[in-house]
Regions:
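N-terminal Rossmann-like NAD(P)+-binding domain of SDR-like oxidoreductases, especially those catalyzing
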Residues: 2-4, 12-204, 329, 337-346, ...
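A short, amphipathic alpha-helix embedded in the catalytic core of nucleotide-handling enzymes
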Residues: 41, 188, 217-222, 249-253
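A glycine/serine/threonine-rich, flexible loop-to-helix segment
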Residues: 68, 159, 211-219
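C-terminal substrate-binding subdomain of Rossmann-fold SDR/epimerase-dehydratase oxidoreductases
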Residues: 79, 222-369
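The catalytic Tyr-centered alpha-helix of NAD(P)H-dependent dehydrogenases
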Residues: 166, 170-177, 207, 211-215, ...
Length: 369
């Protein structure tokens, strides 16, 4: 079931509320992209009720939700999507009819050093959530929007990847777990008629992003006069999208997207990692030659990802935030905030090759019986 936005000729399609309010479960909503989407939906559609479930992992923060946490149409639940009992309770008690599944471990470097944690969170977590949706007794899920990544396509040196013509050939443990999770979603759609939509997005940047990712890490290090570590030669290219544009894309897909479809959420702004570092240095008045240092590359570093977003554009979405403005505002955000108010232990993320490992005392999530 899809909920279509109204649009006028020449305008950017924007979703409009249904007559009957939507009740959404947004997993991973205290993380980077999830928190921006939760904020957009809760403030744009006050008749919608947004339930955020987040286990507040190292890269999440309730402070990311400070604009909406006290709103009457927002409920926050601290919990792990791997907990079948918890998710089932939330689905039934809140009468959820739409699920937006953002919860995931997403840092490629970490996946090389701690790959099983990615399997537990990204694959097993998705399976538990799907099974809870299938077994919910007090509600019926009308849309399960699964958030995936362009990395499931694998390296692409030439053409852009399209949703239904490109094979999934993931090249790192993170991408493999996301590809596996997609297969589960599709299987539940086919086997149990669960209405689903899958999105595959490219690199997103902006405020509230945990500093293990390149742009916030570069901004913090350069502002301190420290070296920016570049993996390998730095000539791998990535496409970058500001989080405001990404959040609007999810809004449009939620309301205008067709079920059983996949939508790429991609930017045309393609840059090498080295050029990104130089742009950050330029904003901060630093000499790149003195600031950038090349270090050992990842175990495998895809040279290029590029995706075709024609289907998303057909829904009316357009990219609004250009690279120059978006990067400058992002660098300013990370260099003028008390970052420890968001993430107490973020300093370890600034290492050239960070490795996060889950706490030994993490409570095991109960599995469905």
């Amino acid at each position: 079931m899809c909920f279509r936005p109204a649009s006028s000729p020449g305008s950017i399609a924007r979703a409009t509320p249904r007559t009957v309010a939507m009740r959404l479960l947004l997993t991973g909503g205290a993380g980077f992209i999830g928190s921006h989407v939760a904020t957009l939906l809760a403030t744009t559609y006050p008749r919608y009720h947004v339930v955020v479930v987040d286990k507040l992992d190292y890269c999440s923060s309730k402070k990311n939700l400070e604009r909406i946490i006290s709103l009457p149409n927002v409920t926050f639940v601290k919990g792990d999507v791997r907990s079948f009992d918890l998710v089932t309770y939330v689905l039934n008690s809140e009468k959820i009819d739409v699920v937006m599944h953002f919860a995931a471990q997403s840092h490629v470097d970490n996946s090389f050093g701690n790959s099983y944690e990615f399997t537990r969170n990204n694959f097993e977590g998705t399976h538990a959530l799907l099974e809870a949706c299938r077994r919910a007794t007090e509600t019926k899920i009308k849309t399960f929007l699964h958030v995936s990544t362009d990395e499931v396509y694998g390296e692409n040196l030439n053409d852009s990847n399209t949703e239904h013509e490109s094979l999934l050939t993931p090249t790192n443990p993170y991408a493999a777990t996301k590809a596996g999770a997609e297969m589960l979603v599709m299987a539940y759609g086919r086997s149990y008629e669960l209405p689903f939509i899958i999105t595959r997005g490219n690199n997103v940047y902006g405020p509230n992003q945990y500093p293990e990712k390149a742009i916030p890490k570069f901004a913090i290090l350069a502002s301190r006069g420290e070296k920016i570590a570049i993996h390998g030669d730095g000539l791998a290219t990535r496409s970058y999208m500001h989080v405001d544009d990404a959040a609007r894309a999810f809004d449009v897909v939620l309301h205008a997207g067709e079920t059983s479809q996949i939508y790429n959420i991609g930017s045309r702004e393609e840059r090498t990692v080295l050029s990104v570092a130089r742009d950050v240095c330029g904003i901060l008045g630093k000499n790149p030659e003195d600031t950038v240092a090349h270090v050992e590359d990842r175990a495998f570093n895809d040279r290029r990802y590029f995706i075709d977003s024609t289907k998303l554009l057909a829904l009316g979405w357009r990219q609004r935030v250009d690279w120059t403005r978006g990067l400058r505002e992002t660098v300013e955000w990370f260099t003028t905030r008390d970052l420890k108010a968001y993430w107490k232990n973020f300093e370890s993320a600034l290492l050239p090759h960070p490795r996060f490992r889950a706490d030994e005392d993490e409570e095991d999530a109960r599995e469905p019986m």
